[in-house]
Amino acid sequence: MELQLAIDLLNKEEAAELANKVKDYVDIVEIGTPIVINEGLPAVQYLNDNIDGVKVLADLKIMDAADYEVSQAVKFGADVVTILGVAEDASIKGAVEEAHKNGKELLVDMIAVQDLQKRAKELDELGADYIAVHTGYDLQAEGESPLESLRQVKSVINNSKVAVIGGIKPDTIKEVVAEEPDLVVVGGGIANADDPVAAAKACKDAIEGR
């Protein structure tokens, strides 16, 4: 089971500084969509140039022109790129092919997908490396949790890894870990903590059963 740090609300320099503080406890560091919107793909390159020992994920939430957009993210140092599960099959297929051609991985974000099990099965067959159940910021505010979605997706896939995103914190991660996802994504639970290093360590300890 891997741990990913999602960084959304910092600039690229602050993101790299935070990532380096916690890199001993995380496997993947995400340059979140807000950073990409504010600073572009050079933010991905900046992180890649300033950290060792972790994979860098570019959260582009691709919807169309997928092979081109994946190729650009890879060019700027991304190891993992995200596409939306509601994208057309042709877009998913193009993204998978482009990522794999370059030895990189594709994470499919299931935010706003209505029939989770049907789409997860299709994405599994299309070759997605990760299928991520995602309770977005707006639904988190309404008290929703990704755990039931995680169970639904896990029950129908054979090849893809399952990731879980949305409101996970050090004090709630154990209930997520109990569902045995392959990747747990924590954002503000680490980034906004008074002590991000301690928060990252607590998350990693939970994943490793300590």
From Swiss-Prot:
GO terms for biological process: 'de novo' pyrimidine nucleobase biosynthetic process; formaldehyde assimilation via ribulose monophosphate cycle; L-ascorbic acid catabolic process; one-carbon metabolic process. Pfam families: OMPdecase. GO terms for molecular function: 3-dehydro-L-gulonate-6-phosphate decarboxylase activity; hexulose-6-phosphate synthase activity; orotidine-5'-phosphate decarboxylase activity. SUPFAM superfamilies: Ribulose-phoshate binding barrel. Keywords: Carbohydrate metabolism, Lyase, One-carbon metabolism. The keyword Lyase applies. It catalyses: D-ribulose 5-phosphate + formaldehyde = D-arabino-hex-3-ulose 6-phosphate. Pathway: One-carbon metabolism; formaldehyde assimilation via RuMP pathway; D-fructose 6-phosphate from D-ribulose 5-phosphate and formaldehyde: step 1/2. The keyword Lyase applies. Catalyzes the condensation of ribulose 5-phosphate with formaldehyde to form 3-hexulose 6-phosphate. PANTHER family: 3-KETO-L-GULONATE-6-PHOSPHATE DECARBOXYLASE SGBH-RELATED (PTHR35039:SF3). Belongs to the HPS/KGPDC family. HPS subfamily. This is 3-hexulose-6-phosphate synthase 3. It comes from Staphylococcus saprophyticus subsp. saprophyticus (strain ATCC 15305 / DSM 20229 / NCIMB 8711 / NCTC 7292 / S-41).
